[in-house]
Amino acid sequence: MDYICIVAIVERGKADFVVKMAKKAGANGATIIYGRGTGETEAKKFLNIHIESSKEVIIILTEKQKAKPIYDEIVRAGKLKDPGTGIIFTFPISNLLGLHHREEFILED
C-alpha cells in the first residue's frame, strides 16, 4: 500500500481547527509542531523590536487514496489560497516504522 505525508504550515492558533476538519475528511490523526519562519517577510517590527511570527506545522500520514480529500479540506479550512496564510505540500513515504498499533499503517510484505 502507498502512503502520503501531508505537511501544512498555518498561522499559530489555527492548527486545531484545520486538523479537526482534516479528520472529518478522512485523516486518522495528526502531529502539530510549533515553528517559526526565517524568511525576510517573517520578521516584523513593533516599537523598533523585531517580532517573529510563529507558525504551526501539521503533519498527517495517510493512505494515498485518502490524501486528496484531506489535502483539499486543509486548503479550505486553513484558507491557504489566501496570500500569507500558509503553505501545504505532500510527499510519498518510502519507509514507515513505528505505527504498529494503527491498523491502517500495517505494511504488507
Predicted regions and their residues:
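Positively charged, small/polar-rich N-terminal and surface patches that mediate targeting and assembly
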Residues: 1-109
